[in-house]
């Protein structure tokens, strides 16, 4: 995931000042741009010198061949005149004046200079890449410039009644329908572990089927992805911070051979976007085949580092969940990817409108975008039991930022193109099932249970097609109020004081 290096090169039509400005708008370090430009300039000089040295080496070999052909004496003099040691001014005429033994010595010295130059070039290349992968994509002009998403995310539109309030939150409702085992899940799987069971399993499967059917009718190809990826491929689709904050590492045997003692490092996927992005790695995609649209289905695994204390109860924010994802490879020309961007968020909106979930669409501020996104719109559903908007969908246009490192090129072959171009890649959540379940539970709660949204009824089993009944009391109704807790603690304290006073009185009587 990187920008085009030519964007940093003024002589190639690039504009480093624009990228520096983008970094500032993202509230990231603009100094990375200057460091990259410096490393790249030195790298280009180093490569130019290496090319010239290789030409000189070939010239030495050619000159030796010509002298041997003429049967000139080889000589045994390895002394090299000082002017010859200045390789920048070395010419064919200068070499012709030397003996074969001297030219061989010069060739060895050139070899040493090439090795030194190559070592320096590799070092500069690594330095350049370290800076390049931490510089974000160019921003779309409509992105709000701010580093405070709580205050400055721009609401683009609202659908449905986002003011209504209801009694219970999803934390209680998952228990009331007996569809969740949280404490036992935590014992088995650790923090945020859970068992989804009973009616909520059916509801989850109904959502998956409905989401896939909806996308299938819009030309998306359903695709069930691998759950883990090789490290070198994951590095091409995920930014560096994700390896520390989001991704789970899996260590396994290097091969299926019993005597193989090597180990292989893989990473569990955080979203099906990651393996689908790599599906056409190292390919040329023909213009007539675009757009290519996939409906990704996978289990997703996320560490949620940095979310300590947030949404610790229920199933809204968990380490493992099912998700259906929209993923599109688009043409980089004629604004096609931005038209597709609007189409994808529109598809998500139609899906949640059909489920009767109120929401608003927010344009995410520049400081909260990941490196790849040029623009991101979120669909945040209204949760009437919690009295808050919560994110259900993220839709991003990454333009050619992801495709460049994955080498997914646009067109036929390099021979057919004046310049190599890369496809644009877009992703959008269709349905993260556990979050959507939470939204349905809060919006469709009644005194007796949860009304099943009409669009999901055909996918539900008999007896659960219209209403999911409450079978357990709400945990919040069983918890003592703060006042009751205070009174109870006060009574215990008073009883303890009375007991202590009685003991002291008994001690006095005994002593007397």
From Swiss-Prot:
Its EC number is 6.1.1.11. Its main location: cytoplasm. GO terms for biological process: cytoplasmic translation; negative regulation of angiogenesis; negative regulation of transcription by RNA polymerase II; negative regulation of vascular endothelial growth factor production; selenocysteine incorporation; seryl-tRNA aminoacylation. The modification N6-acetyllysine is found at residue 323. Signal peptide: none annotated. GO terms for cellular component: cytoplasm; cytosol; nucleus. Pfam families: Seryl_tRNA_N, tRNA-synt_2b. Gene3D superfamilies: Bira Bifunctional Protein, Domain 2, Serine-tRNA synthetase, tRNA binding domain. Residues 479-499 have a biased composition (Basic and acidic residues). ATP binds at residues 302-304, 318-321, 391-394. It catalyses: tRNA(Ser) + L-serine + ATP = L-seryl-tRNA(Ser) + AMP + diphosphate + H(+); tRNA(Sec) + L-serine + ATP = L-seryl-tRNA(Sec) + AMP + diphosphate + H(+). It is found in: Cytoplasm; Nucleus. Catalyzes the attachment of serine to tRNA(Ser) in a two-step reaction: serine is first activated by ATP to form Ser-AMP and then transferred to the acceptor end of tRNA(Ser). Is probably also able to aminoacylate tRNA(Sec) with serine, to form the misacylated tRNA L-seryl-tRNA(Sec), which will be further converted into selenocysteinyl-tRNA(Sec). In the nucleus, binds to the VEGFA core promoter and prevents MYC binding and transcriptional activation by MYC. Recruits SIRT2 to the VEGFA promoter, promoting deacetylation of histone H4 at 'Lys-16' (H4K16). Belongs to the class-II aminoacyl-tRNA synthetase family. Type-1 seryl-tRNA synthetase subfamily. Homodimer. The tRNA molecule may bind across the dimer. Interacts with SIRT2. Interacts with METTL6; interaction is required for the tRNA N(3)-methylcytidine methyltransferase activity of METTL6. PANTHER family: SERYL-TRNA SYNTHETASE (PTHR11778). This is Serine--tRNA ligase, cytoplasmic. It comes from Cricetulus griseus (Chinese hamster). The lineage of its organism: Eukaryota, Metazoa, Chordata, Craniata, Vertebrata.
């Amino acid at each position: 995931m990187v920008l085009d290096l030519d964007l940093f090169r003024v002589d190639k039509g690039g504009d480093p000042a624009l990228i520096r400005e983008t970094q500032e708008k993202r509230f990231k370090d603009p100094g990375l741009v200057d460091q990259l430009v410096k490393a790249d300039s030195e790298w280009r000089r180093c490569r130019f010198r290496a090319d010239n040295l290789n030409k000189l080496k070939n010239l030495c070999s050619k000159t030796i061949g010509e002298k041997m052909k003429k049967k000139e004496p080889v000589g045994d003099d390895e002394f090299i005149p000082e002017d010859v040691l200045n390789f920048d001014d070395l010419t064919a005429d200068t070499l012709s004046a030397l003996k074969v033994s001297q030219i061989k010595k010069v060739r060895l010295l050139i070899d040493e200079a090439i090795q030194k130059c190559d070592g320096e070039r590799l070092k500069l290349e690594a330095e350049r890449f370290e800076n390049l992968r931490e510089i974000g994509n160019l921003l779309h002009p409509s992105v709000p410039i701010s580093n405070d998403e709580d205050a400055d995310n721009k609401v683009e539109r609202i659908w449905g009644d986002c003011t209504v309030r209801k009694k219970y939150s999803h934390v209680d409702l998952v228990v009331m329908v007996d569809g969740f085992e949280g404490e036992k899940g935590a014992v088995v799987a650790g923090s945020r572990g859970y068992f989804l069971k009973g009616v909520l399993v059916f509801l989850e499967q109904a959502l998956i089927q409905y989401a896939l059917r909806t996308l299938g009718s819009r030309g998306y190809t359903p695709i069930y992805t691998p759950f883990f990826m090789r490290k070198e491929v994951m590095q091409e689709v995920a930014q560096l911070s994700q390896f520390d904050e989001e991704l789970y590492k899996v260590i396994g045997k290097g091969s299926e051979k019993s005597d193989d003692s090597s180990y292989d490092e893989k990473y569990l996927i955080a979203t099906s976007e990651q393996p689908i992005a790599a599906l056409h790695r190292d390919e040329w995609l023909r213009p007539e085949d675009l757009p290519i649209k996939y409906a990704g289905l996978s289990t997703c695994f996320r560490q949620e580092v940095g979310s300590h204390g947030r949404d610790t109860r229920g199933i809204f924010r968990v380490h493992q969940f099912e998700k259906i994802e929209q993923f599109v490879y688009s043409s980089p020309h004629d604004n096609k990817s931005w038209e597709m961007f609007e189409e994808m968020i529109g598809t998500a909106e139609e899906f949640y409108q059909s489920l009767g979930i109120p929401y608003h669409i927010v344009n995410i501020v520049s400081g909260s975008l990941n490196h790849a996104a040029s623009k991101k719109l979120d669909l945040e559903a209204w949760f009437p039991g919690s009295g808050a908007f919560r994110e259900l969908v993220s839709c991003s246009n990454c333009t050619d930022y992801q495709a460049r490192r994955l080498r997914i090129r646009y067109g036929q072959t390099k021979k057919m193109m004046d310049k190599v171009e890369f496809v644009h890649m877009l992703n959008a959540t269709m349905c993260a099932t556990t979050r959507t379940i939470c939204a349905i539970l809060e919006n469709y709660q009644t005194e007796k249970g949860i009304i099943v949204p009409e669009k999901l009824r055909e996918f539900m089993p008999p007896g659960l097609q219209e209403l999911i009944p409450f079978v357990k009391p709400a945990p919040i109704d069983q918890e003592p109020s703060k006042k009751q807790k205070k009174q109870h603690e006060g009574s215990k304290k008073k009883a303890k004081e009375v007991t202590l006073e009685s003991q002291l009185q008994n001690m006095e009587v005994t002593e007397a």
